[in-house]
């Protein structure tokens, strides 16, 4: 195979591999405690290889009980390709009525301090926006937290 043919073959392999990249995920920690997230909720992913969207009901998240002082700091962990994190916080087990609080993190911001969360149960729906060379999109994950003051 010639040098030019080898280059094209390698380029084709790189493009095919990049078409199968998974959507980014997000982790959440509060006061050093990892909060378990739900399965992936609604998402859209578009790029040079294909485009796909799926809508679902609001994800059900497992309950994580923890102690944390107010104000509560939410620390997110995710890949560098994520350039937007949007969160809505409801008091209780699910999305009922208007969110108690909403926030937007852009670029490399990965922490948010809630002024509303105190003792009690909270449902968080977190949406990620990302952009890579080969694709872009958004996805969502839910968290369910029971906070107890220290």
Question: Model-derived features: where do they sit?
Answer:
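Short acidic/polar inter-strand loop motif in beta-rich domains
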Residues: 130-138
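Mature extracytoplasmic domains of secretory-pathway proteins
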Residues: 44-46, 51-98
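C-terminal motif of bacterial Sec signal peptides marking the signal peptidase cleavage site
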Residues: 16-18
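Surface-exposed, short loops/turns at beta-strand junctions within beta-sandwich domains
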Residues: 114-122
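Short beta-strand segments within Ig-like beta-sandwich modules, predominantly Fibronectin type-III
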Residues: 101-108
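Transition segment at domain starts
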Residues: 20-61
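Sec-dependent signal peptide recognition
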Residues: 4-12
């Amino acid at each position: 195979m010639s040098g030019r043919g080898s280059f094209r073959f390698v380029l084709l392999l790189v493009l095919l591999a990049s078409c199968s990249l998974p959507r980014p995920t997000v982790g959440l920690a509060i006061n050093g405690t990892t909060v378990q997230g739900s399965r992936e909720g609604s998402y859209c992913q578009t790029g040079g290889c294909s485009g796909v969207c799926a809508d679902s009901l609001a994800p059900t998240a497992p309950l994580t009980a923890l102690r944390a002082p107010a104000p509560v700091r939410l620390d997110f962990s995710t890949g560098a390709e994520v350039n937007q994190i949007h969160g809505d916080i409801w008091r209780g087990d699910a999305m009922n009525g208007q969110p108690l609080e909403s926030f937007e993190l852009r670029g490399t911001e990965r922490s948010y301090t809630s002024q509303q969360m105190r003792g009690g149960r909270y449902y968080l729906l977190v949406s990620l926006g990302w952009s890579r060379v080969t694709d872009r999109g958004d996805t969502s994950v839910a968290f369910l937290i029971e906070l107890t003051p220290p």
